[in-house]
Amino acid sequence: MREYSSRPIKQMNAAWLVGQYNVRMTTITPAEVRFEGGVLRAPAFDDVYHSADGGIAQSTNVFLSGNALPERWLNQLSFQILETGFGIGLNFLVAWNAWRNTVHNPDARLHFVSLEKFPLNHADLTQVLAPYTTLSPLSEALLVAWPPLVAGFHQLKFEEGRVTLTLILGDIQETLPQLTMAADAIFLDGFSPEKNPQMWDDWVIRHLARQTMYRGTLATWCVAGAVRRCLEAHGFTVQRRPGFGRKRERLEGRFDRIPEDAFRRMVTTSRNPVLARIYHQPVAPRRAMIIGAGVAGCLMAERLAQQGWQIDLFDRHAGPAEEASGNPAGILRPVLSRDDNLASRLGRAAFFQTLQTLQRLQARTGTIRHKQSGVLVLAQDETQAALQRNVIGHHGYPQDYVRFLEPDEAQTLSGIAVNWGCWYFPQGGWLDPGSLCAAALSAGAARIQSHWQTPVARIEKTGSWRVLDARGQCLAEAPILILALGAHAENLPQTAELTITLFRGQITQIAHDPFPPQTPVLCQDGYVIPGLESGLCIGATYDNDLEAEPRHASTLENMERLKRLVPDWAPDLLPTMDRVGFRSVCRDRMPLVGALSPEDGLYSVMGMGSRGLIWSSMAAELIAAELAGTPLPLEKDLIRAISPGRFSDSGVRPHADASSA
């Protein structure tokens, strides 16, 4: 049901800034490391990162051989490894190197998930990995992708997406329950139980078992009796094996102490959709239909196409990005909050995912118009400046993610007078949504069939999903249907009960751009994007009506925004063009991403509001992972927070066959 909000816009924006959810935030402290006798040590734990007899050899003998690798992955299209303790990344690099040397099927995928509380900073990791010259091409790629050290899931892709590292930063007691995967192999690593007992306790082993495939394997250098008994208590059969180097013994395990039918029943009630898909859902033809070719729909199509799906993409317009995604530029930046609420955590994860997607698609096509100019979020007064300082200090964010600039620093960077300081996001910038859509469709062109000027009037489920035109003619059918309808969610009864509010937004363009070439994007109560070929872009209004044509009052409102940011320049700048789009906003300001009806194969990537450029890439990754039965790229509570069924106990249950409203 489409709604128009009666709440004041200022009140709604304040709610969006503060957020509705309080969560626990883990500040990430980089590891302190030093070499002693040629071996890397962690002084905080008084322990070594690897055996004195060789790190690569230890990874190969203990973790690869201990899990019967590479033999077990040779005939697998997807293989999932879960590691406790990323350390310096040797286990990942050794596994990746072995996989690329033994697996030659271009459709095969390696998924490596690793949890780490104290990651190395980029400089230390560079120094530590330098001696491992046989792994240099891989370690260099890892260093290029190494993220800012902030809490959460960081999904890094290599080998054109054939290898995925999900690096989870935070305390294992907080992060492991948030993970959803089906591990074929576990690398049980970490500092010794005497030095770091919480990495090896009963609670951790129990949660590892919940993420493991039936007959999945486990390997560790640790043979402590308490660890062995925990593993056996939670379903693993374990055996001692000859150890590596000076270590006399090691352990190998297999998750098979319960009957397989009992495991299947456990999967049914475990709420682990990855295990459930692998064990209970028949393999269907990898065909999907997507309705809507804005940013969300195009990125969804590309992600599935890269995983081997055949896609039919429908849109009522003559090409992609004709509605809200048709603005000349949008802003790339995360959202911060004092309590690190769900919106902030989702925005952070999605921001990093979007940067990865941009890098990947730009390397493939070279056609995306985008500039990593940085983004300044300017405080409006001293009170807000104090809040900005407080947020960064409270969470201990690293400077390569965000930092607070004092007024003189901000003025030097931006070239404008700054009164109170600002947040500065150095990895932020602007992006042309239309060029992103075109690049996504180009990258997936071999498997994407685009149907332009093809409105979908109705959808129905008769075995597979079918999309029909206004005459009732079937346009295509597939087992999976994904709705990326933007402002048109009300047009189908299957989405009519999703309460979505539309907000009009008008932007204004100015042909003359007086800003220096390196000026960052400027944000306050609105934004100014400099550096475009078409000049300046200013926006955007937030209106409670559906007037599709530009209006003079909205132009004046945008010009006032410009005047507040650059009062000395604004009188000389004249508007040259305006454009109107509509944001589709859910009532809690979070998107609608996931299964509308999981047993029926109906999915949503809607309700993106003003954050479609940031959220769409993560939405595509999440749904693609759910469909493939691979590790999910988001924490469980974030997945619940964006689920279309979150507003009712029973979730959304669409009609199987219904005519359009």
PLM feature segments, named:
Residues 572-661:
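C-terminal catalytic lobe of FAD-dependent flavoproteins
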Residues 331-413:
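Dinucleotide-binding Rossmann-like beta1-alpha1 core, especially the glycine-rich loop
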Residues 471-480:
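Core beta-strand elements of the Rossmann-like FAD/NAD(P) dinucleotide-binding domain
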Residues 261-283, 289-307, 316, 324-331, ...:
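Active-site substrate-recognition segment that forms the wall
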Residues 24-80, 96-134, 645:
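Rossmann-like AdoMet
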